[in-house]
A protein has these predicted regions:
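Clamp-loader machinery-focused feature within the broader ASCE/P-loop NTPase space
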Residues: 2-149
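Short gly/ser-rich anion-binding loops that grip negatively charged ligand groups
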Residues: 108-112, 167, 256
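Loop/turn-to-beta-strand initiation segments
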Residues: 133-137, 162-168
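Charged, glycine-rich active-site and insertion segments that engage polyanionic ligands
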Residues: 1-50, 58-59, 66-67, 163-166, ...
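Arginine/glycine-rich "motif VI" loop of SF2 helicases in the C-terminal RecA-like domain
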Residues: 73, 160, 207
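Conserved adenine-binding aromatic site and its adjacent loop/helix in ATP-hydrolyzing domains
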Residues: 124, 156, 183
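Residues immediately C-terminal
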Residues: 145-146, 160, 176
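Conserved catalytic/switch belt of AAA+ P-loop NTPases
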Residues: 127, 152-166
Length: 273
């Protein structure tokens, strides 16, 4: 993953089209939904960046103003990001000082759900005045990682939003959200790109064309998931051999994979079947 201060890569074309369409619509809360691997987080961040940008255009944030820079370096005072701590770390977002200290001192492990303490901080954030005068944004990803207490705290803020506050919830399992949260948001289902468009995007990320097709099949047609496989999973050749190996009961094909990676590989294989 690139560092948080690096220039943001351009959105995949199917996400850029969705961003442009959503920016033409009004609403204080959006729910971006669809299977994992389609780019919910990237689209959510693009919307937040555009809403907070000092010089936004029809295609979103300018990428050069002070607001855009603050988002790139993860210090924007008007953007509140709610994620499991594991996801915060993976995506380059800093934890608050207390949480980071608890983890550094090995008092606990990074959370895999959105913590109640973080949601309470977000409620306080919602009540503050915008620091830069462009409103405020709360980004929640993956939204289904809220527990019941966190979800109810968010619901109250959704029901009584401040005039300059927007929400963007990105979910890979929207059916797990409270129905009342879903009803308070404008829903948008992420589009599936065509195989050709997805393969072209993977090639643009540095994946060989022949490998892109194999990885895309292994990921069930989901481009982001295919890119993660290219960087962290078995080789494309191994993916190509995996179905027959499993038919033979040959578990050696996954012998060099850590248990979580092996489980994910089998899940993707079952998805394809």
């Amino acid at each position: 993953m690139s560092g948080p201060a690096d220039p943001a890569p351009p959105l995949a074309p199917w996400l850029a089209r969705a961003r442009d369409a959503l920016l033409r619509q009004r609403g204080h809360a959006w729910l971006l939904q669809g299977p994992s691997g389609l780019g919910q987080y990237e689209l959510a961040l693009a919307l937040a960046s555009a809403w907070l940008c000092e010089q936004p255009g029809p295609q979103g944030a300018c990428g050069h103003c002070a607001s855009c820079h603050a988002i790139k370096v993860r210090t924007h005072a008007d953007l509140c990001v709610l994620m499991p701590e594991v996801a915060m770390h993976e995506l380059g977002w800093p934890l608050d000082e207390k949480a980071q200290s608890e983890i550094d001192d090995k008092k606990r492990k990074p959370s895999r759900e959105i913590r109640v303490e973080a949601m309470r901080d977000a409620v306080g954030f919602a009540q503050r005045t915008s620091a830069r005068g462009r409103g405020k944004v709360v980004l929640v990803y993956p939204a289904e990682r809220m527990n019941a207490i966190s979800a109810n705290a968010l619901l109250k803020t959704l029901e009584e939003p401040a005039g300059d506050l927007r929400f963007v919830l990105a979910s890979e399992a929207a059916w797990q959200l409270l129905p009342t949260i879903r009803s308070r948001c404008l829903g948008h289902t992420l589009p599936w790109p065509s195989a050709q468009e997805a393969q072209e995007w993977l090639v643009a990320q540095g994946i060989a064309a022949a490998e892109a097709a194999v990885l895309l099949r292994a990921a069930g047609g989901r481009p982001d998931a295919a890119l993660r496989l290219a960087r962290n999973g078995p080789s494309p050749k191994a993916w190509g051999l995996l179905p027959r190996a499993m038919q033979r009961g040959d578990v050696a094909a996954l012998a060099d994979q850590a248990p979580p990676a092996a489980i994910e590989a089998l899940q993707k294989l079952c998805h394809d079947l």
